[in-house]
Amino acid sequence: MALNPLEQFKVYTIIELPKLFGYDINFTNSSLFMMISVILMVLFLLLGIRKGAVIPGYLQAAVEYVYDFVVSIIESNTGSKGLEHIPLIFTVFIFILSCNLVGVLPYSFTVTSHVIVTFALSMVVFTYITIVGFKERGVEFLRILLPKGTPSWLAPIIIIIKLFAYLVRPISLSIRLAANMIAGHTIIKVIAGFVINMNIFFTPAPFLFIIALIGFEVFVAVLQAYIFTILTCVYLSDAVK
């Protein structure tokens, strides 16, 4: 990996399975680390809420903080109407966060570095919001394509532009998340490879610099989960307001 920083993003088969309708459904390293991320996510939540103490311990306090954090994002962008959608938004946030943080660990695989994964997440969010929009507002949901006060002669152009902008939302969401995770991990690998090749790994400055980069990557992992969630809430506000 030190020689090729992009090698860490390669998907390889762990268990080969029979094809399903002509499609490969092999169990890959991506599948493995996605399962690990989900298991860690579920354990974190279950262990945090199993006692439900009035005076919470550290783990329960952490779970409550994450939950309250997501609720505050929803309320600030959608108001009280968006609170009924907490299950989806909280699940998306904690899943992305878990995948991102697992990807920082040595010899792991960053699931969210692949557009196919982030695009699948984005399409779930996009489809859900579109369904909610028509369910809550009916045909009036289409008003998001034409801002109030738009001159009639300009309306056709604006509608086309707004429709295009709406349809590319899942693409922009998925590429933003994947690109940032790829960039961060690649930089760490490049610098770490340089330090190892120069045989200066155990000298203080380069070692501390790599530690700082890893700390920064943890920050980016949390930040990207936050950005994905807040954009989801912004898009949801169009459907419920």
UniProtKB/Swiss-Prot annotation:
One term of GO molecular function: proton-transporting ATP synthase activity, rotational mechanism
Compartmental location: Cell membrane
Principal location class: membrane
UniProt xrefs under InterPro entries: ATP_synth_F0_asu, ATP_synth_F0_asu_AS, ATP_synth_F0_asu_bact/mt, F0_ATP_A_sf
Pfam families: ATP-synt_A (PF00119)
RNA-binding as UniProt keyword: no
Topology of this chain in the membrane: Multi-pass membrane protein
Alphabetical list of NCBIfam families matching this protein: ATP_synt_6_or_A, PRK05815.2-4
Function: Key component of the proton channel; it plays a direct role in the translocation of protons across the membrane.
Entry-linked HAMAP family: ATP_synth_a_bact (MF_01393)
Subunit and interaction comment: F-type ATPases have 2 components, CF(1) - the catalytic core - and CF(0) - the membrane proton channel. CF(1) has five subunits: alpha(3), beta(3), gamma(1), delta(1), epsilon(1). CF(0) has three main subunits: a(1), b(2) and c(9-12). The alpha and beta chains form an alternating ring which encloses part of the gamma chain. CF(1) is attached to CF(0) by a central stalk formed by the gamma and epsilon chains, while a peripheral stalk is formed by the delta and b chains.
Official protein name in the record: ATP synthase subunit a
